């Protein structure tokens, strides 16, 4: 750990990131009754806008908590990279966009991640379960309706990215994170 010199993270940041990871975990648990509907995409994009590369800390805290609760089984392994893809897509976007553009772009990125979640997950599923390429394509096709639900949920949540990111940036400045 380090001070505000720019290297490492401060104790304050570590505590905040732990709470943000726990918030992701609690939000997913609360929304478990709805198949593939959650605010994880919203939170990942907001955290990435506010904390950039440090956003990986709460993301991986959430992934670890998920594994601890549900077990570190084969379903968990793709989570190690699938959620980082959304983080990476957000990192590649310009930091400063006009509000109307940002609203559309962030919502679109969040929606597309939901739509292609099964495609991103499929290679690990195929490797871990012994599916050949055709089996993997069939696996993707059989789950596509859930990816559509995921995309619709991410679209709805994605509409909140701009106001939530502005609030997170304000809190970040206020608490000197």
Predicted regions and their residues:
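Membrane-interface helix-boundary motifs at transmembrane edges
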Residues: 4-9, 93-105
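Membrane-embedded alpha-helical hairpins and interfacial helices in multi-pass inner-membrane proteins
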Residues: 76-77, 99-177
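Residue-level signature of transmembrane alpha-helical entry/exit and packing/kink sites
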Residues: 9-17, 41, 55, 59, ...
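Lipid-exposed faces of alpha-helical membrane segments in multi-pass integral membrane proteins
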Residues: 15, 19, 23-26, 61, ...
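Hydrophobic transmembrane alpha-helices
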Residues: 1-50, 54-62
